[in-house]
Amino acid sequence: MTGFHFALEDYHGYNRFGNPAKALKAYVDCFSKEELTLDCQALVDIGYEMINHYVNEWLPRRNIYKTLIIDGVPQVEVESSIYIPELSEAFGIPVIYQLKYDRVVTDPDGRFWIQDHKTAASFNISKLETDPQVSAYCWAFPYIYGQTSAGMLYSQYKKAIVEEPRILKNGNISTDKTQNTTYERYLKALKERYGNITFPPKNKEVLDILLEQETPESDAFIRWDRVARNEHNNESEYLKILAEGYEMLNPKLAIYPNPTSDCSWSCNFYNVCLAQDDGSDWEFMINEDFEIRKHEEEIWRSKIQYPQ
């Protein structure tokens, strides 16, 4: 969800729109009605709800991280290129490792964290200890900022709408434990219905379940995980980067297709691949049916209308 990322970039950066929902609207306005399919519009609608929950409910109780600012420039969407001398010398060409940080923050103890925003249908934390992106970003940090980071603040946002607690026909609050709501919203609904007295046992049970989902850095819809990497991790990651580089730049590397059951529906080059195998003019197909993709981000960013 590029628009969601842009909204957070502006909000935690220069905050030119004053509200990330307005930033998302500015992003959407960069596209024509023809370009915004029904699926796109559905994601936009969810994006507004995700932003509302993040800004108005989740963040105010967890706003301990501050965007790093250097010479007046907020460190959001930080693009960097790191020269790799070993590979450059080995192949006789400049070899550059490129990456982009969503945001660099400091915690109350003054430590640096690389924040990475992820939108997904569900949370995934099982991969974090071995995630190569986490490791590579932490390895690169000293080359960019001259000091090590504490690690990555891996931030996940569910593509889901936080709903209000359901109200039954008799006016009572539903005790359905699968409601897509939060502890704060459910508690507010109970107080509005029953006042500050003791709540019905079944409602209290649901409230306790929702409370269990709340931590200093997470709820059922957003969670931030601190993923640490030390100096040894960084050294180990660099060796992997070198190994990958030697393989990628090897002029004698044999490159061949790796067909899977998904090819027929997920690969735009499916017919070209078949043509290459059966002797058809696959080069003609490439030249006639394909073009070099333009840098998508440059296109929409050039259309953003910032407030005057």
Task: List each model region and its residues.
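RecB-family 4Fe-4S metal-dependent nuclease core
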Residues: 1-308
